[in-house]
């Protein structure tokens, strides 16, 4: 019995060691894998919302918009609370992954509902609001181009470093923070200066999500950057002490937390680009 238990522990430890050491499941790839799946499920939620709204009558549609927008804003604030909670729990080795999965799920629900409403407007009321599905596609392509460029540029200086996966991840998250806070600040400035007299589609549908939540998220991202530095030190400590099981758990906690951060940063940038597209179209229409 003792030998079988010891064999199980050795086998489990070997699996954990292989998990950490393999290049295909490094921290940075794990983080981007989480973010990619999160964005994929955002699209699934958005398409589901679009299908539900497409079955509503014109009379019920306005009420459905308000209800779904309220749910989106509430879940976005719940997501912010979970960011704070999981940030404090990230470095605790006994923290359950449930907290981090909850963070991902609330992000997916919030951004998925918002995107579903926008898809409905773009497909059903495109002429009335001067808004098309192509605008959403261009916004996603623009955000993907920015984040892809940041990923490529961030990977260049870290090729010769010993722990390049965590160093590269830190650079990407740092730039994600810069992109997010600049987009939120520009949105805030434009709303109260140049475009104070114009009504924007995103402001009518989700004012809290486009400004308040984006601004708060950008501010707490300052703390996330410093948190990543300490988290990187924890991972290096586990690697050097050959505590591979703990390193694996910490890698998953890190991937889920910072993957959620990448999802939020990416979607904030998408909405900002979409905002600029709509403003440009409104000006050209005038």
UniProtKB/Swiss-Prot annotation:
- Keyword annotations for this protein? Cell membrane, Membrane, Transmembrane, Transmembrane helix
This protein's major location comes to: membrane
Query: Any idea where this protein resides?
Result: Cell membrane
Q: Which superkingdom is the protein from?
A: Bacteria
User: Keyword Membrane, does the record have it?
Assistant: yes
Membrane topology, from the record: Multi-pass membrane protein
A Gene Ontology cellular-component term:
plasma membrane
List the transmembrane segments: 30-50, 68-88, 99-119, 136-156, 169-189, 205-225, 254-274
Q: Is Ribosomal protein among the key words of this record?
A: no
What is the protein name stated in its UniProt record? Uncharacterized protein MG320
